[in-house]
Amino acid sequence: MSTTTTVSAIRTVEEMSNITISSHPVVNEQIAILRDRSLKPSQVRSVVDEISRFLAYESTKTLKSPSVSIVPVLRSGMSMMSAFSKVLPDVPIYHIGIFREKSTLQPIEYYNKLPKKSTDTAVILDPVMATGGTANAVITTLQEWGCKNIIFVSVLASEQALTRFSNIPGVEFVIGAVDKSLDAKGYLVPGVGDIGDRLYGATA
């Protein structure tokens, strides 16, 4: 019964015009591996890189503007950089640092290295989109910067967050897979845990 509900929910998200969810079997397989909490940090980084390689091709296949930047969200967005810099080797890379305050779940920006002049298109990298708070903060920052087209790429996202951003003009989402639920701490269920800690072997 729960499987049917989850599939139905994902189909609803897939119908949103600005959201693309990968159907590639390798992406699905690698996300299933990523859910294994016993993986070592080096294995987590390898799996995220492999998924990112497929998402990089998917998210850039319709790029038209020569004015493009890559914006990884520190710290976990850096894990997707290698794959995207191979597909877009000569575009500038700008960094935005945001962390989610644990008690309020609100995003707090602590680093912003955007230049004065914006690019027409920005590809944002953040492997997990849970509540959507961080995504909203980064999108708002880039829009205020003057960026007209935003492509937000995540390995895993919640249905709640994607529904929040449905049909926003100038913003597209390319997602590896969707989880339906969030727990009380704002983590995806079943999710992949704290992806930043898992990537770098840190503890909360």
From Swiss-Prot:
Inhibition and activation profile: Allosterically activated by GTP.
Listed Gene3D superfamilies: 3.40.50.2020
Biological role: Catalyzes the conversion of uracil and 5-phospho-alpha-D-ribose 1-diphosphate (PRPP) to UMP and diphosphate.
Positions annotated to bind 5-phospho-alpha-D-ribose 1-diphosphate: 75, 100, 126-134, 194
Enzyme Commission number(s): 2.4.2.9
Subcellular location: Cytoplasm; Nucleus
NCBIfam families the UniProt entry points to: PRK00129.1
Any one Gene Ontology molecular-function term assigned to this protein's record: GTP binding
Keyword Cytoplasm: yes
UniProt entry tagged with the keyword Cytoplasm: yes
Cofactor section: Mg(2+)
Family statement drawn from the similarity comment of this UniProt entry: Belongs to the UPRTase family.
Family matches, as CDD domains: PRTases_typeI
Lineage: Eukaryota, Fungi, Dikarya, Ascomycota, Taphrinomycotina
Enzyme superclass (EC): transferase
Source domain of life: Eukaryota
The protein, known as: Putative uracil phosphoribosyltransferase urg2
Pathway in which this enzyme or protein is active: Pyrimidine metabolism; UMP biosynthesis via salvage pathway; UMP from uracil: step 1/1
Transmembrane stretches, start-end: none
Binding site for D-ribose 5-phosphate: 187
GO annotation, cellular component aspect: cytosol; nucleus
Keywords per UniProt: Allosteric enzyme, Cytoplasm, Glycosyltransferase, GTP-binding, Nucleotide-binding, Nucleus, Transferase
Cofactor comment text: Binds 1 Mg(2+) ion per subunit. The magnesium is bound as Mg-PRPP.
Residues reported to bind uracil: 188, 193-195
